[in-house]
Structure formats: structure tokens, C-alpha cells
Amino acid sequence: MPRLFFRQLISVVLLLVATRPASAIEVRVSAQALERTLRTQLFNGQQGRYYIRGDVTSACYVYAESPHVTFVQDRIVVHVHAKAKFGTAVHGACIGVSLTTDADVSLIPEAEEESVGFRDARIEHLSESKELNFLLVPFLSRKLPAQMKVNAAVLMRQLLSRSTETTGYALSLGSLKLHSLLVEGDVLVMDADAALKVD
């Protein structure tokens, strides 16, 4: 009788463990991975540029290019190179002034359900030109953080969709809930609960 009870108890425990909705995981993300995401989602125009004003055919324009992501203390720092031609377009040429600068914005990563978000955008470095800064500040403090946001569940599902070909097992992600995102040295550490299925 005690042996039968023990087997039933183990069966119930195993069933409960197997049906738990999610288990804790830790994912470590490099600065280069965030930089690739930024290039894919925002700096995807010709020559890797994002036009803040005008476009590739405009005589007068403002664009940012060459994003570089690093980690400093608890923040993610995005460095961009910006170039502008301010003036009046006359016969396909911009009559005015050309400006070039480097700019930096730092952000704090934030867990948002399934997504990696960013808050507290802080401009660390801007140009000396008030005209250029007038366009760079909204780009750096609002547009860039919004475009860096990544749905981690979608990315993980895309990665797992080819698991049968690469491992012989069909892996799938049922759910993902991000709890925290912290910069630790040269990585962004993501703590989450995830439910994975293996067939």
C-alpha cells in the first residue's frame, strides 16, 4: 500500500511539474545583437542611413548613420553620426550650410511583457548647431528608442521554427514573460519565464 501511494504521489508531482505554465530562463544579449536590430529596424535605407528630413534624392537633408551600441554602467548607449545640408534647393543643389556631428543617447532597458523596451532616454552628446539639434533631439529621444523595441517572443519563435532541420526536434515557444533587463558588464541580461515544447 505505501509503495502504491508513493508511486501515485510521484506521478502527481511529475504531472504538476510537466504542466507548469513557465520556467525561469536567463538570456544574455550582446551590444552587437542590439546594434544589428537597430540597423535592421531603423537604419535600413540606402547606405544604412535614416533620413530625419528629406531623402536620398533631396538636395537639402538631415540623416543619421553608423549606429554603434555599447553598455555603460546600467545604460545602453547608442552613438550615431549625423550629417545635414541646410538651405534652399536650387536646381538640384542645396545652397546653404553643411554640418556633420556625432551624437550619443543613453537608455535604460525595460521589460514589457514579451518585449524589450527602453525608457529614460538621455542625450549625452549633441552638436554645436541649434538647428541640427532641433531635429536630432526628437529623433534620439523618441524615434530611436521606439524603433529599438524588440518583441523577444517573436524572435525566439523565428529561431525555433527551424529547430527540426537543425536538431531533429521540433521546439516551440508557448509563452514568454520578461521580468527584468539589466546591463551587466558587456551583456544585457534578460530574466524571463518561458514555456517551451519539444516534439
Regions found by a protein language model. Give the residues of each.
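N-terminal signal peptide c-region/cleavage motif recognized by signal peptidases
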Residues: 18-19
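Cleavable N-terminal signal peptides
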Residues: 11-12, 22
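Extracellular/lumenal and peripheral-membrane lipid-interaction modules
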Residues: 23-199
